[in-house]
Amino acid sequence: MDSYYKNKKKINFSKMHGLKNDFMVINCIKKNVFLTSHIIKKLSNRYTGIGFDQLLLVEKSNSLLTDFHYRIFNANGNEVEQCGNGARCFGLFLLLKGLTNKKKILISTKKKPLTIEFLTENMIKVNMNEPDFKFYNLSSLQNVLDNNFSIKLINENLICNLVSIGNPHCIIKVQSIKNAPVNIIGDNIEKNPIFPEGVNVSFMEILNKKHIKLRVYERNVGETKACGSAACAAVAVGIAQKLLSDTVHVELLGGKLIIIWKGFGTPLYMVGPAKHVYDGYIYI
């Protein structure tokens, strides 16, 4: 048995989740960890690996202006720009491992830096920056109304809204999320050639100006229990179109978030829980 592990690398990790959106978190600050997409896929397998929606790497900051660097990989091994639920778990990991004693930290990402503020032991507030409604090349889309776009599917044109929260989102307003064909439409839109890097697709049911329900198809993954950046994107669309107030409770399959946005020219905030499940190690 000892010979089996002789040429393998031991990796310590934590299993965490935010509203059942689950993560494998690895501390890479003192020990550089390189994982290929093939290895990440194997680790993400819920039957033969650890099992997770995303892998989060905690890295040393490359700048004096930020405290840490935050990297995110989907279960298929692709590195992505943003994960809101992951950001809260990233912050809790830093606290639990004694890597910071600050009440507020600034972390760098593949795109824009994020501010993480610790409100209570497991309730965390993240500054997700200002939503970007102008990041798409819209030449291939028909502008139906202000920030309403028509995407041609197999049998119909679907009205949606496009916004970036550091990663791309397509928001569809529905009367009820209960019977929404999340995986069918989500997969169809994600594979549309107008989104060469894919897109996260969310179905939003507005209950009132302070409360929405949301189901999310995450690119390269499928429907997930929760997606923090999707909650931010949906609320941003609702506020921009004056359908929602500046503080909104978002009900996802995995739990609830609070999203706060005062409007254009200001940052958007996400408030929600993070949970540590267990620590472990694996040989690869």
Swiss-Prot record:
Its main location: cytoplasm. NCBIfam families: DapF (TIGR00652). Its EC number is 5.1.1.7. Pathway: Amino-acid biosynthesis; L-lysine biosynthesis via DAP pathway; DL-2,6-diaminopimelate from LL-2,6-diaminopimelate: step 1/1. The record marks Y278 as: Important for dimerization. The keyword Zinc does not apply. The record marks H169, E218 as: Could be important to modulate the pK values of the two catalytic cysteine residues. Keywords: Amino-acid biosynthesis, Cytoplasm, Isomerase, Lysine biosynthesis. GO terms for molecular function: diaminopimelate epimerase activity. The active site is at C83, C227. This is Diaminopimelate epimerase. GO terms for biological process: lysine biosynthetic process via diaminopimelate. It is an enzyme of class 5 (isomerase). It is found in: Cytoplasm. GO terms for cellular component: cytosol. Belongs to the diaminopimelate epimerase family. Catalyzes the stereoinversion of LL-2,6-diaminopimelate (L,L-DAP) to meso-diaminopimelate (meso-DAP), a precursor of L-lysine and an essential component of the bacterial peptidoglycan. HAMAP family: DAP_epimerase (MF_00197). It catalyses: (2S,6S)-2,6-diaminopimelate = meso-2,6-diaminopimelate. Disulfide bonds: none annotated. InterPro entries: DAP_epimerase_AS, DAP_epimerase_DapF. Homodimer. It comes from Buchnera aphidicola subsp. Acyrthosiphon pisum (strain 5A). It holds the Pfam family DAP_epimerase. Substrate binds at N21, Q54, N74, G84, N85, N167, N200, E218, R219, G228, S229.
